[in-house]
Amino acid sequence: MEEITCAFLLLLAGLPALEASDPVDKDSPFYYDWESLQLGGLIFGGLLCIAGIAMALSGKCKCRRTHKPSSLPGKATPLIIPGSANTC
């Protein structure tokens, strides 16, 4: 029974594809030129990568570290000292 149900659901899922219009219909509002979109994305990504590498190697973006003295004491006192734990 499970095989019949799966086959029926697959048939129902595939029916809209049989009635679909031609995927090459360039006048359709759902037509996308995927090759041009992919090429444009690759070019844009490559330019961003090159710009990032150039910015990192230029040395203009340096981390400015201000050495402020720490507000913590020089030596911290331990929270647990030997002999302070209770034995149950």
Swiss-Prot record:
<dbReference type="InterPro" id="IPR047297">
    <property type="entry name" value="FXYD_motif"/>
</dbReference>
<keyword id="KW-1003">Cell membrane</keyword>
<keyword id="KW-0813">Transport</keyword>
<keyword id="KW-1133">Transmembrane helix</keyword>
<dbReference type="GO" id="GO:0071805">
    <property type="term" value="P:potassium ion transmembrane transport"/>
</dbReference>
<feature type="topological domain" description="Extracellular">
    <location>
        <begin position="21"/>
        <end position="38"/>
    </location>
</feature>
<keyword id="KW-0740">Sodium/potassium transport</keyword>
<dbReference type="GO" id="GO:0043269">
    <property type="term" value="P:regulation of monoatomic ion transport"/>
</dbReference>
<feature type="topological domain" description="Cytoplasmic">
    <location>
        <begin position="60"/>
        <end position="88"/>
    </location>
</feature>
<dbReference type="Pfam" id="PF02038">
    <property type="entry name" value="ATP1G1_PLM_MAT8"/>
</dbReference>
<keyword id="KW-0812">Transmembrane</keyword>
<comment type="similarity">
    <text>Belongs to the FXYD family.</text>
</comment>
<protein>
    <recommendedName>
        <fullName>FXYD domain-containing ion transport regulator 4</fullName>
    </recommendedName>
</protein>
<dbReference type="InterPro" id="IPR047283">
    <property type="entry name" value="FXYD4"/>
</dbReference>
<comment type="subunit">
    <text>Regulatory subunit of the sodium/potassium-transporting ATPase which is composed of a catalytic alpha subunit, a non-catalytic beta subunit and a regulatory subunit. The regulatory subunit, a member of the FXYD protein family, modulates the enzymatic activity in a tissue- and isoform-specific way by changing affinities of the Na+/K+-ATPase toward Na(+), K(+) or ATP.</text>
</comment>
<dbReference type="GO" id="GO:0005890">
    <property type="term" value="C:sodium:potassium-exchanging ATPase complex"/>
</dbReference>
<feature type="transmembrane region" description="Helical">
    <location>
        <begin position="39"/>
        <end position="59"/>
    </location>
</feature>
<keyword id="KW-0739">Sodium transport</keyword>
<dbReference type="GO" id="GO:0051117">
    <property type="term" value="F:ATPase binding"/>
</dbReference>
<keyword id="KW-0915">Sodium</keyword>
<dbReference type="GO" id="GO:0006814">
    <property type="term" value="P:sodium ion transport"/>
</dbReference>
<feature type="signal peptide">
    <location>
        <begin position="1"/>
        <end position="20"/>
    </location>
</feature>
<keyword id="KW-0630">Potassium</keyword>
<dbReference type="GO" id="GO:0016323">
    <property type="term" value="C:basolateral plasma membrane"/>
</dbReference>
<comment type="function">
    <text>Associates with and regulates the activity of the sodium/potassium-transporting ATPase (NKA) which catalyzes the hydrolysis of ATP coupled with the exchange of Na(+) and K(+) ions across the plasma membrane. Increases the apparent affinity of the transporter for Na(+) and increases NKA activity.</text>
</comment>
<keyword id="KW-0633">Potassium transport</keyword>
<keyword id="KW-0406">Ion transport</keyword>
<keyword id="KW-0732">Signal</keyword>
<dbReference type="GO" id="GO:0017080">
    <property type="term" value="F:sodium channel regulator activity"/>
</dbReference>
<dbReference type="InterPro" id="IPR000272">
    <property type="entry name" value="Ion-transport_regulator_FXYD"/>
</dbReference>
<keyword id="KW-0472">Membrane</keyword>
